[in-house]
Amino acid sequence: MNDQVEAFLRHLADERNLAANTIAAYRTDLDQFCDFVSARNRREWRDVSHDDILSFMLYLRERRYASSTVARRVAAVKSFFAFLTGSGAVPHDPTERIDSPKVDRDLPRALTPHQVDELLELPLRSPTPERIRDKAMLELLYATGMRVSELVALNMTDIDLVHSTVRCTGKNGRVRVLPINGSAATALEEYCDNSRSQLARGSDAPIDALFLNHRGKRLTRQGFWLILKQYAEEMGLGELTPHMLRHSFAVHMLNAGADLRAVQELLGHTSISTTQIYTHINHASSAQPVRSEPRATEVNGVINEQALVPEEK
């Protein structure tokens, strides 16, 4: 049974060009499902029945998995059996009459503009090479709304400080070129001109990565998460996740009057409905101040002047 799971995962990588993190999530979901049906004495995938699928969903609910997790597990199983059916490995699809569970969709959590300002000022209170790097990363995240996975994948050649743009590669290899504001450009210039070379001394060979760790290697998502956790503790915040900066960018842009379609392109969303969820968040503390924030006004000005560079095909 594991051989067919591996074949499916290779299909996701080679044919559908899914990201490594997405494939890892599929593996986790299918490993749990495989353990479940094996415990029910199913030795071949053709032995799995409609009742097995329903029992798996009940199993997840009884263990109080979040509705989003149940929905993801079921979606992974449905995709897997569609693959098996299409390849002729099973005669019928036991998930065919299974409805995807409804997901209780929580609104994204965003920081207020005041909290963003405090976060962006924290690194320079003790300007070490690492914290100057942190300043550049945080400014860039808030200025562009890019994902952390996109941030840590940036190379030196992706930054164009002359034209104030950054080129990032998103999900499914989609490339977009984003404008950056003056605050982010200044922070990046300071980092690239001074701090990066100090961090690079820890590396045995030249490296293209834009953001380096203290050993001179490319900073990882996990490394960034630990950095952000440190700043959250310094601010006294109960929780601060990397994605909250992306949420904050979107909410503050829309509250300041930015066009929904422009924000969709900046975020790299394929569907406008994904971006629309941010219109339901309107912090009383962020509706007005964001208009007078130099950082936010500058970004919003880029949008209003239609300086957004279209996503490359």
UniProtKB/Swiss-Prot annotation:
The keyword Repeat does not apply. PROSITE patterns: CB, TYR_RECOMBINASE. Keywords: Cell cycle, Cell division, Chromosome partition, Cytoplasm, DNA integration, DNA recombination, DNA-binding. Residues 1-85 form the Core-binding (CB) domain. Pfam families: Phage_int_SAM_1, Phage_integrase. Belongs to the 'phage' integrase family. XerC subfamily. HAMAP family: Recomb_XerC_XerD. This is Tyrosine recombinase XerC. It comes from Roseiflexus sp. (strain RS-1).
